[in-house]
C-alpha cells in the first residue's frame, strides 16, 4: 500500500494530467529546486536510488515536476493524505474479503504516513533503521499517523465472520511492534528479531523472552519470522549444502566437509 507500479493506470493518468489535478494528487508530486526546477525538491535518499525523487520526464511526464518514491523509481509512492487513496484501498480490501480471502500481508506497513510539511526536513542518509528511535515522528518510517489508516482497515476486517487477518511487515523498534499487532489495528506484526539476532542459543532465548513479555504487556501477539523474500532464507542459512554426501558428513562428525564449514554457503535469497 505504500506505492504502485509506474505502469499502474493511476500513475499513467497522473503523468498525463496537469499540475494540481486530482489524478496527480493520488501520488506525491512537487516542483524541483534550482532556476528551472532541475534539482530534486529535497535531499532525501531512497532504498534503491541516490534520490527519493525522480523527474517525471523519466516516464514521459511533461509538467516539470518530481515524484516521490522511497524505493525504486518504478514504485511511485501513494499520497496517503488524500482521502481518495484511503477509499480505494478500503474498496480493494472489501473486494477480496467478500470473495473469501483469509487475510492480507501488509508490505512496508510502517511507511505509508510521511512528513510532507515544507520546507522539507533534511535526510541525506536513508532513514532506514535509524527511524526506529524516532518515536513516531520521523520523516518516513513508523509515523504515528499510520495507525489511523489501520484502524479504518480493522473496522472493515471485523465486519466478517471470522474477521479477516492482517499481518504487518514493519521494521520498527521492538517497543513499537504492539502498535501494529494491536486488535484495534492490524492484529499481527512480523517480529524480525530472529533475522537480526546472532545465531546463538542465548541470544535467541533473550530475544524470545523479550518479545513474549512485550506482547503480554500490551495484550498483543508474537509473529516469529526467520526469513522472508528480502533476506537469506533460513533453509539456506541452516541447511546442509546439497553437494554434501550426508552419510559421509555425519560419519565425519558433521563438520569436516570443505563445502560445509558453515551453514548457508549457498547464501540464496528467495
Residue positions per predicted region:
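Acidic/aromatic-lined carbohydrate-recognition and catalytic surfaces
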Residues: 1-94, 98, 111-174
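Short, solvent-exposed beta-strand-terminating loops
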Residues: 109-120, 232-242
Amino acid at each position: 500500500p505504500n506505492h504502485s507500479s509506474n505502469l499502474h493506470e493511476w500513475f499513467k493518468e497522473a503523468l498525463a494530467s496537469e499540475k494540481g489535478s486530482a489524478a496527480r494528487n493520488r501520488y506525491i508530486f512537487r516542483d524541483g529546486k534550482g532556476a528551472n526546477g532541475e534539482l530534486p525538491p529535497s535531499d532525501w535518499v531512497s532504498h534503491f536510488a541516490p534520490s527519493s525523487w525522480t523527474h517525471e520526464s523519466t516516464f514521459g511526464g511533461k509538467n516539470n515536476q518530481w515524484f516521490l518514491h522511497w524505493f525504486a523509481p518504478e514504485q511511485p509512492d501513494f499520497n496517503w493524505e488524500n482521502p481518495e487513496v484511503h477509499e480505494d484501498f478500503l474498496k480493494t480490501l472489501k473486494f477480496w474479503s467478500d470473495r473469501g480471502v483469509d487475510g492480507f500481508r501488509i508490505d512496508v506497513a510502517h511507511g505509508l504516513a510521511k512528513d510532507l510539511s515544507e520546507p522539507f526536513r533534511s535526510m541525506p542518509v536513508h532513514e532506514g533503521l535509524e527511524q526506529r528511535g524516532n518515536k513516531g515522528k520521523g520523516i518516513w518510517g513508523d509515523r504515528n499517523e499510520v495507525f489511523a489508516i489501520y484502524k479504518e482497515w480493522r473496522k472493515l476486517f471485523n465486519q466478517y465472520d471470522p474477521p479477516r487477518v492482517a499481518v504487518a511487515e514493519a521494521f520498527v523498534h521492538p517497543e513499537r511492534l504492539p502498535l501494529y499487532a494491536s486488535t484495534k489495528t492490524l492484529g499481527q506484526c512480523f517480529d524480525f528479531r530472529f533475522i537480526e539476532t546472532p545465531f546463538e542459543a542465548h541470544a535467541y532465548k533473550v530475544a524470545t523472552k523479550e518479545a513474549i513479555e512485550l506482547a503480554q504487556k500490551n495484550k498483543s501477539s508474537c509473529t516469529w519470522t526467520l526469513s522472508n523474500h528480502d533476506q537469506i532464507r533460513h533453509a539456506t542459512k541452516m541447511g546442509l549444502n546439497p553437494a554434501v554426501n550426508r552419510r559421509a558428513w555425519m560419519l565425519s562428525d558433521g563438520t569436516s566437509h570443505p563445502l560445509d564449514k558453515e551453514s548457508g554457503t549457498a547464501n540464496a535469497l528467495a
